[in-house]
């Protein structure tokens, strides 16, 4: 695999003109797809504020600030000195607490997807104006529940070995997962099972909205049967053994993705991968028949850019991904021998002369198969089944009815994905984001080894959109309203009708 990578950053002072978004959607129900409990698809920071002797400080002012966007939310502690910030986007935060007669204390915390971070703040008696700062990272051990959870951030995702950059492949890092290769109703292939449950028992969410395949209820894929969008993901969590009501729906794993968003600094990346015939050995079976290496060409690329529209207020992020490939399919083809064709035509001339033109056309297709000269007599009994004699000719292992050819044929497949996200801090109590995703591709659904006239393709467009508004009520209540929609189509047709 050949790979090029470039990452670029620009200073925050390059913020562009302010764009006013005249859209505020309040929605109770999801449009088109179910939503899942935000406790599993967001983060949480909670803790207590205490004085030097460990007594709770009620009504202390606690301010949470996002380190990337400087968005802040203020609440007050309850009668036991406890506070909680829920429905948070994973990221870096600072929590500061203040109260009359005490020094200000600040706790820097990293909130990961699906986690509840404890950030206790101890306030000292104010002898002079000063502040105390405490740092903490993500918890190593989950103490809130018995769920088995694996969290992977964007940096870890970027270095994870992942041919094809399949978004769903990050779940393979979790305990209890087994690649499903049994096929059947859910294809096998890139899907997986957790603790013996079927591969269609898993729930996939994107920013809290359902992202399962609408027909097979497995991971949602495009024309290449890969889940594009890995470059758009900020963090992923995989929850197993999650039988509490917040996960709902299915008993398998809950695989949750959170998308990237713009910040106060411009940031982005560009990467390119290539794989081709020069990097791959010949297939064993083709080599045995003296066939050359088949043409292979795979090009994959991603690029993204995010930043401020108005510093501390409005942000954008766009991601574009694409893959174009030609990969041969290895197939075994049984071809009639010339002796068998002659015997069939001779017999038809005697019993059904009107059928001769049809069979001549049929045999003509077989005789035009690429690589037919390499076909070998490897079928049991010469491939004759119960045919022993026809039109005076005896058939069997020494005079076969059919020869077998190991062939590799191909046609191009392509897929691309474009994502746009807009975030806005609407005062201290409201935060809004709108995300739109479009994917489109052309799949080589069937490649015929005999004649390309029988090739089939499938056009597979998809649209997803989501609007999310988070509102804080007073000092101790928060609500998140989400509307999402998913539209998918798979149109199958013959390449050469």
Regions found by a protein language model. Name each.
Residues 128-130, 139-191, 196-203, 208-245, ...:
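Acidic, glycine-rich flexible loop segments
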Residues 85-87, 307, 471:
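Short, flexible loop/turn segments at beta-strand junctions in immunoglobulin-like
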Residues 2-4, 8, 14-153:
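Periplasm-facing N-terminal accessory domains of Gram-negative outer-membrane beta-barrel systems
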Residues 50, 65-67, 98, 195, ...:
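A generic structural motif
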Residues 52, 67-69, 100-102, 275, ...:
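Short coil/turn motifs at secondary-structure junctions
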